[in-house]
Amino acid sequence: MTEYKCSTQPSSSNCRTKYRTYITAIKSKPFLILAGISGTGKSRIVRELARACWDVDSNEYETQKPRNFEMIQVKPNWHDSSELIGYVSRIGADQNGNGISFVVGDFLKFIAKAWEEPDVPYFLCLDEMNLAPVEQYFAEYLSVIESRKVDREGNVVTDPILKQNAQSWYWNLCTELTDDEKLRAQFRDKGISIPQNLIVVGTVNMDETTFSFSRKVLDRAMTIEMNDVDLYGGLTHRYEQIGKVSSEHLVGNAVEGVDVYESNKDVCDVVINYLQEINKKLEGTPFKVAYRTRNEFLLYIVIISRIIRMILARSYL
Protein backbone atom coordinates (compact mmCIF):
# COMPACT_ATOMS: atom_id res chain seq x y z
CA MET A 1 0.00 0.00 0.00
CA THR A 2 1.24 3.48 -0.85
CA GLU A 3 2.24 5.41 2.28
CA TYR A 4 0.03 8.41 2.88
CA LYS A 5 1.81 11.10 4.88
CA CYS A 6 -0.20 14.30 4.64
CA SER A 7 0.34 14.27 0.88
CA THR A 8 -1.39 17.53 0.05
CA GLN A 9 1.54 19.35 -1.52
CA PRO A 10 -0.05 21.67 -4.10
CA SER A 11 1.30 22.39 -7.54
CA SER A 12 0.94 26.14 -7.05
CA SER A 13 0.93 28.56 -4.13
CA ASN A 14 -2.11 30.64 -5.04
CA CYS A 15 -4.98 28.96 -3.16
CA ARG A 16 -6.95 31.54 -1.24
CA THR A 17 -7.67 31.16 2.45
CA LYS A 18 -11.42 31.44 1.81
CA TYR A 19 -11.45 28.14 -0.07
CA ARG A 20 -9.19 26.15 2.22
CA THR A 21 -12.14 24.63 4.11
CA TYR A 22 -13.83 23.41 0.92
CA ILE A 23 -10.65 22.01 -0.58
CA THR A 24 -9.69 20.19 2.61
CA ALA A 25 -13.18 18.71 3.00
CA ILE A 26 -13.21 17.49 -0.61
CA LYS A 27 -9.81 15.89 -0.30
CA SER A 28 -10.96 14.15 2.87
CA LYS A 29 -14.06 12.77 1.14
CA PRO A 30 -15.35 13.57 -2.37
CA PHE A 31 -18.97 13.98 -1.23
CA LEU A 32 -19.73 17.43 0.15
CA ILE A 33 -22.96 19.11 1.23
CA LEU A 34 -23.14 22.92 1.26
CA ALA A 35 -26.02 24.08 3.45
CA GLY A 36 -27.20 27.59 4.13
CA ILE A 37 -29.58 30.39 3.34
CA SER A 38 -30.62 30.95 -0.26
CA GLY A 39 -28.42 33.18 -2.41
CA THR A 40 -25.09 32.67 -0.64
CA GLY A 41 -23.38 31.33 -3.76
CA LYS A 42 -23.27 27.63 -2.93
CA SER A 43 -23.52 26.38 -6.50
CA ARG A 44 -21.22 29.18 -7.69
CA ILE A 45 -18.46 27.90 -5.42
CA VAL A 46 -18.65 24.47 -7.06
CA ARG A 47 -18.47 25.96 -10.55
CA GLU A 48 -15.55 28.20 -9.60
CA LEU A 49 -13.59 25.33 -8.07
CA ALA A 50 -14.04 23.43 -11.32
CA ARG A 51 -12.93 26.51 -13.28
CA ALA A 52 -9.86 26.89 -11.05
CA CYS A 53 -8.57 23.52 -12.29
CA TRP A 54 -7.67 25.21 -15.59
CA ASP A 55 -5.07 27.82 -16.53
CA VAL A 56 -6.49 31.36 -16.57
CA ASP A 57 -5.63 31.80 -20.25
CA SER A 58 -7.36 28.57 -21.34
CA ASN A 59 -10.72 28.25 -23.09
CA GLU A 60 -12.11 26.12 -20.25
CA TYR A 61 -11.39 28.89 -17.73
CA GLU A 62 -13.17 31.50 -19.83
CA THR A 63 -16.23 29.45 -20.75
CA GLN A 64 -19.47 29.65 -18.78
CA LYS A 65 -19.43 25.90 -18.09
CA PRO A 66 -16.04 24.16 -17.93
CA ARG A 67 -16.15 20.60 -19.20
CA ASN A 68 -15.27 19.27 -15.74
CA PHE A 69 -18.45 20.76 -14.26
CA GLU A 70 -22.02 19.53 -14.43
CA MET A 71 -25.04 20.93 -12.61
CA ILE A 72 -28.15 18.81 -12.19
CA GLN A 73 -31.27 20.43 -10.76
CA VAL A 74 -33.04 18.00 -8.44
CA LYS A 75 -36.79 17.70 -9.07
CA PRO A 76 -39.39 17.21 -6.31
CA ASN A 77 -40.87 14.14 -8.04
CA TRP A 78 -37.65 12.09 -7.98
CA HIS A 79 -38.17 8.85 -6.07
CA ASP A 80 -35.59 6.61 -7.73
CA SER A 81 -32.32 6.89 -9.65
CA SER A 82 -33.78 6.72 -13.16
CA GLU A 83 -33.28 10.46 -13.78
CA LEU A 84 -29.66 10.40 -12.62
CA ILE A 85 -28.31 7.01 -13.66
CA GLY A 86 -30.90 5.89 -16.20
CA TYR A 87 -33.17 2.92 -16.77
CA VAL A 88 -33.73 -0.09 -18.98
CA SER A 89 -36.36 0.58 -21.66
CA ARG A 90 -38.37 -2.18 -23.31
CA ILE A 91 -40.12 0.14 -25.73
CA GLY A 92 -39.77 -1.40 -29.18
CA ALA A 93 -38.44 -4.70 -27.81
CA ASP A 94 -39.88 -8.04 -28.92
CA GLN A 95 -40.96 -10.96 -26.75
CA ASN A 96 -37.45 -12.40 -26.83
CA GLY A 97 -35.95 -9.22 -25.41
CA ASN A 98 -34.41 -8.03 -28.65
CA GLY A 99 -34.38 -4.25 -28.90
CA ILE A 100 -34.05 -3.57 -25.17
CA SER A 101 -32.07 -0.36 -24.60
CA PHE A 102 -30.76 1.72 -21.71
CA VAL A 103 -31.80 5.36 -21.39
CA VAL A 104 -28.72 7.07 -19.95
CA GLY A 105 -29.00 9.62 -17.14
CA ASP A 106 -26.82 12.73 -16.92
CA PHE A 107 -24.97 11.46 -13.84
CA LEU A 108 -23.85 8.29 -15.60
CA LYS A 109 -22.72 10.30 -18.64
CA PHE A 110 -20.66 12.56 -16.39
CA ILE A 111 -19.11 9.56 -14.63
CA ALA A 112 -17.90 8.30 -18.01
CA LYS A 113 -16.46 11.73 -18.86
CA ALA A 114 -14.56 11.79 -15.57
CA TRP A 115 -13.10 8.35 -16.32
CA GLU A 116 -11.81 9.66 -19.66
CA GLU A 117 -9.80 12.42 -17.96
CA PRO A 118 -8.49 10.96 -14.68
CA ASP A 119 -5.96 13.74 -14.02
CA VAL A 120 -8.63 16.48 -13.90
CA PRO A 121 -11.04 16.85 -10.93
CA TYR A 122 -14.64 16.58 -12.14
CA PHE A 123 -17.39 18.33 -10.16
CA LEU A 124 -21.03 17.25 -10.14
CA CYS A 125 -23.30 19.79 -8.44
CA LEU A 126 -26.71 18.54 -7.29
CA ASP A 127 -28.58 21.80 -6.94
CA GLU A 128 -31.15 21.90 -4.13
CA MET A 129 -30.55 18.22 -3.52
CA ASN A 130 -33.13 17.98 -0.72
CA LEU A 131 -36.11 18.94 -2.89
CA ALA A 132 -36.63 15.16 -3.10
CA PRO A 133 -35.74 12.34 -0.67
CA VAL A 134 -31.99 11.86 -1.15
CA GLU A 135 -32.10 8.29 0.18
CA GLN A 136 -34.37 7.33 -2.72
CA TYR A 137 -32.99 8.99 -5.84
CA PHE A 138 -29.34 8.77 -4.73
CA ALA A 139 -29.43 5.35 -3.06
CA GLU A 140 -26.85 3.69 -5.31
CA TYR A 141 -24.28 6.43 -4.79
CA LEU A 142 -24.81 6.49 -1.01
CA SER A 143 -24.11 2.77 -0.95
CA VAL A 144 -21.15 2.81 -3.32
CA ILE A 145 -19.37 5.75 -1.63
CA GLU A 146 -19.00 3.55 1.45
CA SER A 147 -17.23 0.85 -0.57
CA ARG A 148 -14.24 3.10 -1.27
CA LYS A 149 -10.86 1.52 -0.55
CA VAL A 150 -7.23 1.96 -1.53
CA ASP A 151 -5.98 -0.78 -3.86
CA ARG A 152 -2.44 -2.15 -4.10
CA GLU A 153 -1.47 0.53 -6.62
CA GLY A 154 -2.57 3.30 -4.25
CA ASN A 155 -5.71 4.19 -6.21
CA VAL A 156 -9.09 4.72 -4.56
CA VAL A 157 -11.62 2.29 -6.05
CA THR A 158 -15.32 1.56 -5.45
CA ASP A 159 -17.90 -1.08 -6.19
CA PRO A 160 -19.77 -0.47 -9.47
CA ILE A 161 -22.69 1.93 -9.38
CA LEU A 162 -23.99 0.04 -12.43
CA LYS A 163 -23.06 -3.63 -12.39
CA GLN A 164 -21.68 -5.54 -15.35
CA ASN A 165 -24.36 -7.26 -17.40
CA ALA A 166 -24.09 -9.85 -20.17
CA GLN A 167 -27.11 -8.56 -22.09
CA SER A 168 -26.74 -6.67 -25.34
CA TRP A 169 -28.22 -3.45 -23.95
CA TYR A 170 -25.32 -3.17 -21.51
CA TRP A 171 -22.76 -3.78 -24.25
CA ASN A 172 -24.40 -1.03 -26.33
CA LEU A 173 -24.46 1.28 -23.30
CA CYS A 174 -20.70 0.94 -22.84
CA THR A 175 -20.23 1.78 -26.51
CA GLU A 176 -22.45 4.85 -26.16
CA LEU A 177 -20.74 6.20 -23.04
CA THR A 178 -17.19 6.46 -24.39
CA ASP A 179 -15.07 6.19 -27.53
CA ASP A 180 -12.12 4.93 -25.49
CA GLU A 181 -11.80 1.21 -26.26
CA LYS A 182 -9.81 0.49 -23.09
CA LEU A 183 -12.47 2.18 -20.98
CA ARG A 184 -15.25 0.33 -22.79
CA ALA A 185 -13.53 -2.95 -21.99
CA GLN A 186 -13.20 -1.93 -18.33
CA PHE A 187 -16.92 -1.10 -18.11
CA ARG A 188 -17.91 -4.36 -19.80
CA ASP A 189 -15.67 -6.50 -17.60
CA LYS A 190 -16.08 -4.81 -14.21
CA GLY A 191 -19.14 -2.59 -14.39
CA ILE A 192 -19.20 1.20 -14.10
CA SER A 193 -17.73 2.44 -10.82
CA ILE A 194 -17.01 5.90 -9.41
CA PRO A 195 -13.68 7.35 -10.62
CA GLN A 196 -11.29 8.74 -8.04
CA ASN A 197 -11.43 12.24 -9.57
CA LEU A 198 -15.23 12.61 -9.34
CA ILE A 199 -16.41 15.07 -6.68
CA VAL A 200 -20.10 15.28 -5.81
CA VAL A 201 -21.35 18.45 -4.13
CA GLY A 202 -24.95 18.97 -3.08
CA THR A 203 -26.40 22.38 -2.30
CA VAL A 204 -29.09 22.61 0.35
CA ASN A 205 -31.65 25.22 1.37
CA MET A 206 -33.55 24.34 4.53
CA ASP A 207 -37.14 25.60 4.36
CA GLU A 208 -40.72 24.30 4.33
CA THR A 209 -40.43 23.09 0.70
CA THR A 210 -37.56 20.67 1.31
CA PHE A 211 -36.91 17.29 2.93
CA SER A 212 -34.71 16.95 5.98
CA PHE A 213 -31.62 14.74 5.81
CA SER A 214 -31.45 11.39 7.55
CA ARG A 215 -28.40 10.38 9.56
CA LYS A 216 -27.56 7.95 6.74
CA VAL A 217 -26.95 10.86 4.37
CA LEU A 218 -25.19 13.14 6.85
CA ASP A 219 -22.91 10.32 7.99
CA ARG A 220 -21.72 9.78 4.44
CA ALA A 221 -20.93 13.38 3.52
CA MET A 222 -18.70 16.24 4.60
CA THR A 223 -21.01 19.12 5.51
CA ILE A 224 -20.28 22.85 5.51
CA GLU A 225 -22.78 25.49 6.61
CA MET A 226 -22.77 28.73 4.62
CA ASN A 227 -24.65 31.48 6.39
CA ASP A 228 -22.06 34.29 6.30
CA VAL A 229 -22.44 36.89 3.55
CA ASP A 230 -19.85 39.41 2.34
CA LEU A 231 -21.86 42.00 0.42
CA TYR A 232 -18.68 43.29 -1.24
CA GLY A 233 -17.87 39.84 -2.57
CA GLY A 234 -17.95 39.39 -6.35
CA LEU A 235 -18.00 43.11 -7.15
CA THR A 236 -14.41 43.53 -8.30
CA HIS A 237 -13.79 40.32 -10.29
CA ARG A 238 -16.01 38.36 -12.66
CA TYR A 239 -14.60 35.04 -11.45
CA GLU A 240 -13.51 34.00 -7.98
CA GLN A 241 -9.80 34.61 -7.47
CA ILE A 242 -8.94 31.12 -6.25
CA GLY A 243 -5.70 30.55 -8.11
CA LYS A 244 -4.78 27.34 -9.88
CA VAL A 245 -6.11 24.25 -8.12
CA SER A 246 -4.68 20.91 -9.20
CA SER A 247 -5.70 17.32 -8.72
CA GLU A 248 -3.15 17.13 -5.90
CA HIS A 249 -5.20 19.66 -3.93
CA LEU A 250 -8.54 17.93 -4.38
CA VAL A 251 -8.17 14.20 -4.99
CA GLY A 252 -7.33 12.22 -1.89
CA ASN A 253 -5.51 8.90 -1.82
CA ALA A 254 -6.62 7.84 1.65
CA VAL A 255 -10.01 6.50 2.69
CA GLU A 256 -9.77 5.12 6.22
CA GLY A 257 -7.88 5.86 9.39
CA VAL A 258 -5.56 2.93 8.71
CA ASP A 259 -4.32 4.74 5.59
CA VAL A 260 -2.93 7.66 7.62
CA TYR A 261 -2.44 6.56 11.21
CA GLU A 262 1.01 4.94 11.19
CA SER A 263 2.59 7.86 9.30
CA ASN A 264 0.91 10.52 11.46
CA LYS A 265 0.54 8.94 14.91
CA ASP A 266 1.29 12.15 16.81
CA VAL A 267 -1.59 14.18 15.41
CA CYS A 268 -3.91 11.16 15.11
CA ASP A 269 -3.49 10.26 18.78
CA VAL A 270 -4.50 13.79 19.77
CA VAL A 271 -7.68 13.44 17.69
CA ILE A 272 -8.52 10.00 19.07
CA ASN A 273 -8.05 11.16 22.67
CA TYR A 274 -10.37 14.09 21.98
CA LEU A 275 -13.03 11.82 20.46
CA GLN A 276 -12.76 9.42 23.39
CA GLU A 277 -13.53 12.28 25.77
CA ILE A 278 -16.60 13.13 23.68
CA ASN A 279 -17.77 9.52 23.82
CA LYS A 280 -17.47 9.53 27.60
CA LYS A 281 -19.94 12.42 27.69
CA LEU A 282 -22.24 10.58 25.28
CA GLU A 283 -22.20 7.28 27.17
CA GLY A 284 -25.65 5.70 27.19
CA THR A 285 -26.86 7.64 24.12
CA PRO A 286 -27.11 6.55 20.45
CA PHE A 287 -24.92 9.48 19.40
CA LYS A 288 -21.43 8.22 20.25
CA VAL A 289 -18.66 8.73 17.69
CA ALA A 290 -18.20 5.54 15.65
CA TYR A 291 -15.58 4.34 13.18
CA ARG A 292 -16.79 6.26 10.12
CA THR A 293 -16.73 9.58 11.97
CA ARG A 294 -13.36 8.75 13.52
CA ASN A 295 -11.89 7.98 10.10
CA GLU A 296 -13.12 11.24 8.61
CA PHE A 297 -11.81 13.22 11.58
CA LEU A 298 -8.38 11.65 11.11
CA LEU A 299 -8.29 12.26 7.36
CA TYR A 300 -9.37 15.89 7.71
CA ILE A 301 -6.94 16.70 10.52
CA VAL A 302 -4.00 15.03 8.77
CA ILE A 303 -4.68 17.05 5.62
CA ILE A 304 -5.26 20.39 7.35
CA SER A 305 -2.23 19.95 9.60
CA ARG A 306 -0.07 19.53 6.52
CA ILE A 307 -1.57 22.69 5.00
CA ILE A 308 -0.92 24.64 8.21
CA ARG A 309 2.72 23.57 8.19
CA MET A 310 3.02 24.73 4.59
CA ILE A 311 1.40 28.06 5.46
CA LEU A 312 3.87 28.57 8.29
CA ALA A 313 6.64 27.80 5.82
CA ARG A 314 4.97 30.24 3.38
CA SER A 315 4.80 27.61 0.67
CA TYR A 316 1.01 27.38 0.38
CA LEU A 317 -0.35 30.93 0.35
Which sequence ranges carry the predicted segments?
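Alpha-helical lid/collar subdomain of P-loop NTPases
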Residues: 237-317
